[in-house]
């Protein structure tokens, strides 16, 4: 692999932090973070994985007590008891020291972990809630990061499957010090990189058959109304879609539709002249067909029979394919002016290598490849498991246009912080199905400016556009005010962007990070800190019938004590100001 695909890692832990037996190894990385390995052949993994890059923590204070039943390991935070046999619920336990709970703060191997949750791969086709994965913080004081099935990162930049039948767990036992737990998660798995400044403004995104002319007319109208955008998201109709059926569905494509965009470089240049950056949508799954302009060159390189137009199969498990994938499909488009890619992978988590998720491959290599010309890299794709925070930005998928979907998004975005995933981009306003509701659109847009990425989106339906002037006056004014305010917040957001990188604190911070001992902080699921200076509780339910007010639950502390209120406010004006606290 090229040098650009080689990731900086430091995966070997200090020997002073290791306790090694015949078939186990315990590594005390911090006084609250312990790596637990078991391998029948007594061979342990010191290379980096997809998830874990850095195990070179400083020397840690701990002591070991050996007895007839096994060993006990003590730190200032933890008490580990282990019988030195294959990991089991009766043979391995860790207790969190301190007065957290009478019995809930003891973990036994294999038990279900009750943490404060993390995030999910996607919100595709979701109406309301979806099951969330694990995070690294818990009211019980501990959580588990299971790295047993991660692929190994090789020194040359490629990956290989790890040995089967091993246990490789990381025990996070930080009590209620959630910030420190998250900080050490980043220390272990790598920092969240900074985003380019332009990513923090407004994005215009729609699945729609635009042409160069119609797109620029739309941007002109936004300019006339003083509605600023910094990112243009061009969905799949940028490429040929109406292809001969022998080439497939046209869902995957890499050749510009010259009927719509006769001069792509000119089109992208016009957007750059406006201060906008562009991402193109790609669905890689169907490979490269004979109708693509770069097909012959890529087929020759891949050894495919191009005279018979055999397809170049999408094989992300092949380094040869991935090299050609960038060389022929993406670099030429970037030379024309494409800034980053929207990787719209929806075909599951299997490929030719067992345990290797194609989504992770595309996210990892697209992000690394995007820095090729010295730019600050970015990609735009779904979540592929712990460690995905290294490849911002996350695309949460095709949600339903319902109040239930809006009501879930603030909570979904907030819990993602618990697994270090701080840059979700949602389909603001929803993508499909559901119903047309002006109030819902206004509220969703208002929430959008206090979400990590403000990306208005809609489907190809003629009735689903998110242009503010499509809605009645009060909604139009609310949307326009929101979009202008988001643009004005770019300096603040960029400061928080740096804070996320430098201080390991995502933009969205759950209330319980600041107030872990207050039960109320866990009850206001849709309330959060938006950077260091703002607290947000968006309105995510319809206004009260017969009144021009809406209700949202808010909790905060004052010098006089703790207050829980049900806040009612005007839909557009008063609630707008309230939401912007």
Ranges and model annotations:
Residues 41, 78, 142, 149-151, ...:
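Short, glycine-/Ser/Thr-/acidic-enriched flexible segments
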Residues 5, 29-68:
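A low-complexity, Ser/Thr/Gly/Pro-enriched, surface-exposed linker/loop concept
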Residues 193-350, 389:
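Aromatic-lined carbohydrate-binding/catalytic grooves of carbohydrate-active enzymes
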Residues 303-342, 374-402, 456-478:
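Alpha-amylase-like alpha-glycosidases and glucanotransferases acting on alpha-linked glucans and related
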Residues 64-199, 206-207, 212-224, 578-581:
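Catalytic and substrate-binding clefts that recognize carbohydrates or anionic sugar/phosphate headgroups
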Residues 203-206, 233-234, 272, 276-289, ...:
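Aromatic-lined carbohydrate-recognition surfaces of secreted/lumenal glycan-active proteins
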Residues 367, 387-394, 408-412, 416-426, ...:
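Catalytic core of carbohydrate-active enzymes
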């Amino acid at each position: 692999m090229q040098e650009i695909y080689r990731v900086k890692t430091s995966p070997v832990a200090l020997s002073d932090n290791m306790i090694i037996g015949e078939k186990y190894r315990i590594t005390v990385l911090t006084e609250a973070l312990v790596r637990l390995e078991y391998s029948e052949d007594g061979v342990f993994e010191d290379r980096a994985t997809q998830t874990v890059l850095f195990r070179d923590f400083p020397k840690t204070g701990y002591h070991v007590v050996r007895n007839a039943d096994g060993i006990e390991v003590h730190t200032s935070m933890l008490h580990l008891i282990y019988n030195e046999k294959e990991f089991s619920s009766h043979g391995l336990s860790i207790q969190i020291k301190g007065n957290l709970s009478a019995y809930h703060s003891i973990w036994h191997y294999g038990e279900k972990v009750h943490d404060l949750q993390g995030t999910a791969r996607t919100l595709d086709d979701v109406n309301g809630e979806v099951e969330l994965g694990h995070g690294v913080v818990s009211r019980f004081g501990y959580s588990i990061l299971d790295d047993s099935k991660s692929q190994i990162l090789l020194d040359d930049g490629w990956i290989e499957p790890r040995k089967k039948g091993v246990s490789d767990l990381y025990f996070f036992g930080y009590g209620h010090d959630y910030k420190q737990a998250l900080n050490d998660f980043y220390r272990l798995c790598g920092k969240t990189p900074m985003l380019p400044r332009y990513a923090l403004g407004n994005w215009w995104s729609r699945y729609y058959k635009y042409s160069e002319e119609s797109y620029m007319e739309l941007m002109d109208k936004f300019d006339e109304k003083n509605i600023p955008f910094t990112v243009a998201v061009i969905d799949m109709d940028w490429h040929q879609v109406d292809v001969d059926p022998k080439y497939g569905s046209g869902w995957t494509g890499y050749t510009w539709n010259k009927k719509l965009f006769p001069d792509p470089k000119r089109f992208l240049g016009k957007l750059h002249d406006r201060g906008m950056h562009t991402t193109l949508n790609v669905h890689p799954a169907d490979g490269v067909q004979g109708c693509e302009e770069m097909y012959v060159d890529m087929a020759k390189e891949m050894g495919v029979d191009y005279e018979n137009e055999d397809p170049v199969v999408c094989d992300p498990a092949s380094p040869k394919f991935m090299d050609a994938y960038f060389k022929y499909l993406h670099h030429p488009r970037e030379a024309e002016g494409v800034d980053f890619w929207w990787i719209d992978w929806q075909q599951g988590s299997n490929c030719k290598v067992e345990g290797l998720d194609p989504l992770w491959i595309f996210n990892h290599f697209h992000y690394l490849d995007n820095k090729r010309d010295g730019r600050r890299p970015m990609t735009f794709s779904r979540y592929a498991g712990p460690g995905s925070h290294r490849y911002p930005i996350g695309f949460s998928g095709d949600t339903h246009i319902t109040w239930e979907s809006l009501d879930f998004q603030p909570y979904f975005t907030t819990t993602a912080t618990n697994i270090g995933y701080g840059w979700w981009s949602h389909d603001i306003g929803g993508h499909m199905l559901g119903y047309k509701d002006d109030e819902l659109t206004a509220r969703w847009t208002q929430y959008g400016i206090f979400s990590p990425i403000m990306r208005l989106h809609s489907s190809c339906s003629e009735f689903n556009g998110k242009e503010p002037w499509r809605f009645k006056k009060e909604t139009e004014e609310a949307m326009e005010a929101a979009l202008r305010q988001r643009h004005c917040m770019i300096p603040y957001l960029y400061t928080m962007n740096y804070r996320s990188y430098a201080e390991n604190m995502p933009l969205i911070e759950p209330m319980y990070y600041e107030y872990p001992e207050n039960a109320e902080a866990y009850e206001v699921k849709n309330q959060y800190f938006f950077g260091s200076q703002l607290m947000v509780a968006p309105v995510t339910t319809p206004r009260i019938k017969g009144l021009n007010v809406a209700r949202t639950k808010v909790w905060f502390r004052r010098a006089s004590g703790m207050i829980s209120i049900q806040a009612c406010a005007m839909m557009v004006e008063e609630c707008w100001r309230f939401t912007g606290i």
